[in-house]
Amino acid sequence: MVEGMGKAGFFRWLCLEIAKLVKYRTIPVFITFMLMSFVLAMFIDSITVILFLAAVTLELAQTLKCNPVPIILSEIFCANLGGSATMCGDPPNIIIGTSLGYTFGEFISNTGFIALISLVVIVIYFYLCFHKELAGQGAVVQITSYPDPKEAITDKGEFAKSCVIFLLAVVLLVTHAQTGLTVAFIGTFIAILTLVTQYKDAKELLAKVDYKTLLFFIGLFVVVGGLEQTGVLEEIAGLISKLSGSNGMLM
């Protein structure tokens, strides 16, 4: 799904639209990109979000004549926070949520509020650290000189399909407790739907899947399963319990 969105130009279009909305002013771009990375990472892997945002940030920084490092650095922090807020934000969240039987709502009710508070702190912190540097930068350029968001869309049909599929994925994930669908089923369904609707680029999309990461997690699960079956994890848990004196706070 994410590769399909990227190929259709969704992420570049979104970034340029937001930059245009704040009239390409450096400080507003700095803040809105932090918020955008947080929101996107709630539903898309944070590393993927940063890869797409960083590319557009570098493009805008060249046009605005500003240092892209503070913006990208803040995006990384906010993307990590966004990924921690929901059950589908990052692979560890999916593992924890599914193993404990949490729904999307139950997971976000435990982590979402903490993530939001942390977001406010991070935004204020980075603003205080970099607002003077960024405020002193930025070239005065005619609006017509900035990249047009519409030019980011490589194919209007594929772009529309990608937007619909993304919204469908969000709706299914949020309502999976009511529908009875598992997170694994939703992910597989969305992937198949993307390949069917973008069948012309199916081979290219499949080639861009991060198989190394998938194999890593498969191997990791095998190792953890072996440790669990042999009782090693139980022994480690017992040792931690003894060392902490069964104190919940220390554990």
Predicted regions and their residues:
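Membrane-embedded alpha-helical segments and adjacent helix-loop junctions characteristic
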Residues: 1-67, 211-251
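Flexible hinge motifs at transmembrane-helix junctions and intramembrane kinks/re-entrant loops
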Residues: 156, 160, 168-188, 203-204
